[in-house]
Amino acid sequence: MTLIKSISGIRGTIGGPAGDTLNPLDIVKFTSAYATFIRRSGASKSNTIVVGRDARISGEMVKNVVCGTLMGMGYDVLNIGLATTPTTELAVTMSGAAGGIIITASHNPRQWNALKLLNEKGEFLTAANGSEVLSIAEKEDFEYADVDALGKYTEDDTFNKRHIDSVLALKLVDVEAIKNAHFKVCVDSINSVGGVILPELLDALGVEYTFLNAEPTGDFAHNPEPLEKNLGGIMDELKKGGYDMGIVVDPDVDRLAFICEDGKMFGEEYTLVSVADYVLSKTPGNTVSNLSSTRALRDVTEKHGGSYCASAVGEVNVTTKMKDVHAVIGGEGNGGVIYPESHYGRDALVGIALFLSSLAHKGCKVSELRASFPNYFIAKNRIDLTASTDVDAILVKVKELYGKEKDVTVTDIDGVKLDFPDKWVHLRKSNTEPIIRVYSEATTMEQADELGKKLMQVVYDMQ
C-alpha cells in the first residue's frame, strides 16, 4: 500500500486502486477534512486558503482537485503557483490567510505526491491538530457550501519576489559582502521549483551561477534526495574547477546541501552547523535540532556560550522546542535550516543567504570552512522485524538495560537515544513499517557503524 496518512498530511504514489494510492477521491476527502478543521478551530477570521506546489508531473492535477474542493467547502483559494515549501509558508502570513496546503512529496521520487497542511501562522499542524484532521477524514464529517457560498479562486505569482525580499532584509544577510566576494556557484535544482526561485535570489545577491537540471518539469534527472550517492553530476562539475561551491536543494527547497570547491561533499549534517556558527557569532543564544542530528551543533553552540536542546524528530517538534527555549536558530540534520527571524520553517533560501554571508566575511574556501568544525560521522542502519513484534516493548528493554550505566544518558522522547561521552545511538520505530531505524554517530565512520551494529545485535538478542 502506498497511501500514507499521518499527522503531517497525506502522501502516496499516483495511480492505482482507490484507497491504496494518492488519488482524487482521497485528495477530496482529506482536503475537505482540513477545511473543516480550519473552520472549526476558529484561529483565523480569514476565509482564504493558500495553495502552492512543486513542479511534480502530477502537481497540476492534484492542485486542481485541492482548489476545487476548497471552493466547494466555501473557502476562497489563493493559488501562488509553482512555489517552494517555505514560500508557501510565508505566503500564508503575508496574505493573512487562514491556512495553506503545500502540494509536494519533498524528496520522494517522481511518482509520489502529497499534501502538507499549514495553520494560520504558516506552520505545520501540531500532532493533536493533525490527528483531528485524520479523524474528520475517517468519519467524513464535513459539509459543503451551497451555491451562493462557494469560494472564489485567485492567482498571485508575486510571492517568490516577496520571499526573496524578506531574505535580503534579514540583518545577518550581508548583501554587499556577498556581492563584493564575486562568488561563482553551480546549482542542482532537480527539475523543480528551485530552478524558478534560486536564479532570482542569486541575481539579487550578485552571485554568478551555472544551473544543472534547471527546467521545472518534475521529471527528475536523478533521485531527488540531496545525498552524496545521488549527486555525482554536480560533484563532477565542481571537480572541473572554476567554482567556489555547489548548492543542492530538494524538489520543494526546504532541504539544502553544499559541495566544496573541490567537488567533495560539505556534508548535509553540516549545513545547519555552519549556518548556526555564523548566526551564533553575531547573535549568541540557544539552538535546537532533532535527536538524530549531529552532535557538532551542540559543540558549536557551547563554543558561543549558548545551550543546545534536542527535540523529537519532525519539523513541528523542532519548532515547538525552539519556541520553548527561545532558540536563535535550529533545524534538522537533513539540511533543514530554521531561522526564526524569517519564519518557523525549513528554508533553503535563508540557508543559502546566511551561508554566503558567512563565507564572504571569513574569506576562506568552503573546504576550509568545513575543516573548522568538529568532525563526526553518522551511520544509518535498520532492524527488520515481523508485524507481530512489540517494538515499544523492545525499546523499553533497551532503555532499562542502558539506564543502569553511569556514562550513558538515556533520552526517550522519541524512541530511545543513548548518549555516550564520545558517541551516540538513536533507535526509532517507523510509523509505517515494522522496522527500527538505527542512527549512530562517532568520530569515525567505523566506530559509528560498530555502535549501530552493536545495538542491532542487542535488539535481535531480545527477541
What name fits each language-model region?
Residues M1-G68, G72-M73, K152-V185:
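An N-terminal, well-structured beta->alpha segment
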